[in-house]
Design a protein with these regions (language model features):
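The N-terminal extracellular segments of secreted preproproteins, especially immediately downstream
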Residues: 15-18, 70
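Short alpha-helical hairpin
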Residues: 67-91, 298, 302
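Acidic/polar-rich alpha-helix caps and helix-coil junctions
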Residues: 3, 19-60, 92-272, 294-457
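Bacterial N-terminal signal peptides
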Residues: 8-16
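Transmembrane alpha-helical insertion/packing segments
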Residues: 61-65
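Bacterial N-terminal signal peptides that target proteins for export
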Residues: 1-8
């Protein structure tokens, strides 16, 4: 979709593609912004991209779903591949390089607003600064998940960039430093008490993304605290089974338990493209191991009919969204890793009651035995899967199918390797492919910038 974008920035910035250069802004005959309204045009461009479904970098869009679901194992590429739908991460490296570069352009825009409006006491300034901190924090979270290895605090992180310096050559630092920096960005956004929905990133949306950050970085105490806060105080409730299909397949509305989503503008000029994208995704059936999670009577689980047709092809709206059910699933897993197994199971059952008609609560004694043919065989700590954790993973896979989650679950839990056959050739997803490479031009410009393992140029 990149060739379809029409950038209509009110301000023109001159930038280069390297990390050091494209974060620098050099006015060339342009009026430097001064008023709140002039700075607002920078952030509103980014917000409009989210609402119209053009944004791939903050909340994400259908293109991002197509990539993540195509390269994961939710769809069975061994049965059917398509030239219109990704199937192997190794074929997508060039696209991920574009994602890396374009993400930094958004960081640049956020830094412009933060650097010039922070401290102004107008409601417009505070709204813009809060949104900028939130967007920048989400970009860093996304970059960490895609361009860093699975969480290990001393491994390389993402360069930390606060201002514009054409001579700057920031190093990657560590993942712990990236986590602490990103957490601080979210805290700065929350400190401004954002409530205006025109800036999209209100308090509960920011807290949800902060919970996702804590979850990725395995800070289970923080996950428990934030998720309980959202569940208890946000006013959002798990969508009941009777309303699930309407909520999950709403074309452009934010319904029920959805805290935030992309593509809420139903008059987007890209709607024709999204229609094609949905058709591309529906050219590959769901894999049998996903389908079997719905049991002998899949029609009792409302997620099944809302996700698949009779031939296992996708019918679920492929949108990037953040929902309360994800908070519940993160909470269950956090309790599990803290050793509070009963609380973990309670939340699994709470979700099941809102998804499966006539659901019977699971107990420790009735949890199914661990399946030996699953792709994920160890958790994020390298420990063997248990029946309870398998139940959490099963609900997560069913719940967040076609929302871009499975690829990162595979990465987070052991980076299993597997292969698909296409046109008589075998394509193997190696462990290193779960982490995209840092842009080569940045490595060439800054020899101190460490490349990710597995990539040589």
């Amino acid at each position: 979709m990149r060739h379809l974008r029409t950038f209509t920035l009110a301000l023109t910035f001159i930038f280069c593609v390297s990390c050091g250069n494209y974060l620098n802004v050099q006015p060339q005959g342009q009026v430097i912004p001064k008023t709140d309204e002039e700075f607002a045009s920078i952030i509103h461009k980014r917000l409009n991209d989210i609402e119209g479904g053009e944004d791939e970098f903050v909340i994400g869009n259908m293109d991002m779903i197509k990539y993540l679901e195509g390269c994961s194992d939710n769809l069975d590429a061994n049965i059917m591949t398509s030239s219109f739908l990704e199937f192997f991460a190794g074929e997508e490296i060039d696209k991920r390089q574009h994602f890396y570069r374009d993400s930094w352009k958004i960081v640049r825009d956020c830094n412009i607003v933060i650097g010039n409006l922070a401290g102004r006491d107008t409601e417009t300034a505070k709204g813009l600064v809060s949104a900028s901190y939130a967007i920048k924090g989400i970009i860093y979270y996304n970059l960490m998940r895609e361009f860093c290895q699975p969480w290990e605090e001393n491994l390389p992180g993402i360069p930390l960039v606060d201002n514009f310096d054409i001579d700057s050559r920031p190093r990657r630092g560590t993942m712990k430093q990236t986590y602490e920096y990103t957490e601080k960005l979210f805290d700065e956004a929350l400190a401004l008490n954002p409530t205006d929905k025109k800036y999209i990133f209100t308090t509960w949306v920011i807290k949800a993304y902060k919970a996702k950050l804590e979850f990725w970085c395995q800070n289970w105490d923080n996950v428990i605290s934030i998720c309980n806060d959202i569940i208890d105080n946000s006013g959002y409730l798990l969508t009941p089974a009777s309303d699930y299909a309407a909520m999950i397949n709403a074309p452009s509305e934010t319904k029920g338990e959805v805290l935030v989503r992309s593509h809420v503008n139903n008059s987007s000029g890209l709607d024709w493209y999204f229609s094609y994208t949905k058709n591309y995704i529906a050219t590959r059936p769901a894999c049998a191991k996903l389908i079997r999670l719905f049991g002998e009577n899949p029609s009792e689980d409302v997620r099944y009919a809302a996700s698949f047709d009779k031939k296992r092809f996708n019918v679920k709206m492929p949108e990037c969204r953040v929902r309360l059910s994800e908070m519940v699933l993160m909470l269950a897993e956090a309790y599990y890793h803290k050793g509070e197994k009963d609380k973990a199971l309670d939340w699994v059952n709470e979700l099941r009651r809102n998804r499966i008609n006539g659901a019977i609560d699971l107990t420790m004694s009735t949890l199914p035995a661990v399946r030996t043919d699953e792709r994920i065989v160890v958790d994020c700590k390298g420990m063997a899967i248990t029946p309870l954790l398998q139940a959490i993973f099963d609900e997560r896979r069913k719940e967040l199918y076609m929302e871009g989650d499975r690829w990162f679950e595979l990465k987070r839990n052991g980076r299993p390797e597997w292969w698909v056959i296409s046109n008589g050739l075998k394509f193997t997803t190696k462990a290193y492919l779960y982490t995209a490479p840092i842009v080569k031009s940045d490595i060439d410009l800054n020899p101190d910038l460490e490349q990710n393992p597995g990539y040589e140029y």
